[in-house]
């Protein structure tokens, strides 16, 4: 790793060359329109924290019997469980075409990775982000709390999973949630224009 000692000088040198182009996302993602009671829980595989989330989802599901929770779980964990369906919680190792299912679901609960976050914002899908904050995933934590005041999604701190029922209730009862994301989502187009302007 190279440590830059003249950070301020470097920033001053290149600041006029930096152009904000907007966020990059799939523009074909349809706008959300609730058509079922499914709550998709997509919080990664083969990670210790997914077990903590799973245990919390089992408790949460009892409080929301009218919702159908569908949660991804690694095969290695599923083999240890006696059933793949527990009450109104379905476990699966994969949710095919999740980005399309987001368009009609009641709610999405997910980590705050860049692609998932952009799909949520583009489709205006009601969602709860549980941002990872360990290792090199601190960007999820920073982004989630930077966007939270915009009310484009709810945030549940991974260290405060006990608050998840309250957050879910708030998300599904607030008819004005989520708010539209008002910042540019045209990052691809704008980047292409800037590159063409630079090379021509």
What does each model-identified segment do?
Residues 19-21, 90-93, 153-160:
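Short acidic-hydrophobic, aromatic-tinged amphipathic segments that line or gate anion-handling sites
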Residues 96-100, 115-116, 163, 167, ...:
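Short acidic active-site motifs
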Residues 123-169:
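Nucleotide-sugar donor-binding patch of glycosyltransferase catalytic domains
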Residues 22-107:
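Donor-nucleotide binding loops and adjacent catalytic segments primarily
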Residues 97-141:
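A donor-sugar binding/catalytic signature common to diverse glycosyltransferases
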Residues 1-20:
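Active-site-proximal region of nucleotide-activated glycan assembly enzymes
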Residues 5-8, 78-81, 116, 136-144:
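Short, glycine/polar-rich helix-capping loops at beta-to-alpha or helix-loop-helix junctions
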Residues 166-200:
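C-terminal amphipathic helix plus adjacent low-complexity
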């Amino acid at each position: 790793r190279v440590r830059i000692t003249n950070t301020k000088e470097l920033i001053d040198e290149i600041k006029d060359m930096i152009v904000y182009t907007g966020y990059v996302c799939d523009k074909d993602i349809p706008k959300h329109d609730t058509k079922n009671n499914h709550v998709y829980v997509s919080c990664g595989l083969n990670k210790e924290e997914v077990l903590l989330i799973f245990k919390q989802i089992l408790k949460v599901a009892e409080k929301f019997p009218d919702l159908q929770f569908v949660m991804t779980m690694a095969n290695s964990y599923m083999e240890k469980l006696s059933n793949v369906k527990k009450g109104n919680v379905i476990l699966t190792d994969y949710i095919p075409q999740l980005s399309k299912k987001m368009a009609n679901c009641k709610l999405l609960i997910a980590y705050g990775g860049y692609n998932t976050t952009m799909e949520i914002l583009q489709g205006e899908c009601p969602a709860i982000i549980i941002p990872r904050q360990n290792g090199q995933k601190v960007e999820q934590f920073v982004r989630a709390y930077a966007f939270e005041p915009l009310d484009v999604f709810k945030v549940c701190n991974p260290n405060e999973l006990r608050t998840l029922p309250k957050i879910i209730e708030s998300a599904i009862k607030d008819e004005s949630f989520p708010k539209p994301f008002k910042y540019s989502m045209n990052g691809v187009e704008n980047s292409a224009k800037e590159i063409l302007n630079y090379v021509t």
